[in-house]
């Protein structure tokens, strides 16, 4: 029982219903003006550039009422003294650009370098147990500076792309699980500043007229540079998270697929496809106030092996396939909720078979 109910001597039976009702809304208005272009510096060298102006307007309303006549509380239900009737808004504008150089070093081969600015607009955490004191503050905009150099190759049989990149993000917007008030929610927060660096390679190779190989590999290191302690947490109880991993950022991912087309004389082709996909381990939540990750939030690495066989018609405009997903029947989770027992398990976490139809117009 809440203190108010106690003062009245009101008892709470096991089957009593204690509830509250929340009415909430959010409105997001965005408009932008952008343009890009290419200027030929020479026959082999080009300057690429672009500019974008963005205007965001975000507003919310929230009204929550405790429905119990005695103001009693329950799991996820705050007392009547914390009923809300709040509204707020935030406006944000941004000017971001991109500039780069492309140079053709030989026929079908190009090297390039680019600098790009990124922007993600502001927002609010509006949910059932909204607390105006903390949640009424807007989530600030996220801005980034990205650098990339790379190499591209294109011929009749091979397409190859290689890139090295580094991105500095300020005001990184991240989801953080909050299990206060007896119920877990996902709270968006400006976690701080992060850096992402890595290298990527992908290719498509026509090994024969009938066999095509497609693959890629990415090594990425995403780390927290500076962490912003939540406003509701005492600064003395909040430790430095510098150097720790950014959630949902596996260090290594790679894939390889093969497809073989067998032509027939009956107006359709038969195809066989197989793929192998690997995803490294990753954390699904930000580190806690102690600067340590919850061990349960570490999602193990996993491998996916898929296969399919089918028929294609009219130059692959239509396909009918028998599919097999997760042939190794390897279970995995994609998200941890932060409450020590709840994970999000995707459909592909179990082996299954089916029929698929695809059409292109």
Where are these regions (language model features)?
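Solvent-exposed loop segments that connect transmembrane elements
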Residues: 1-23, 59-90, 124-137, 174-189, ...
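Residues that define the transmembrane beta-barrel architecture of outer-membrane proteins
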Residues: 27-31, 91-95, 143-147, 154, ...
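Conserved C-terminal beta-signal and adjacent last beta-strands/turns
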Residues: 40, 147, 244-361
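Membrane-embedded beta-barrel scaffold of Gram-negative outer-membrane proteins
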Residues: 104, 110-120, 127, 138-206, ...
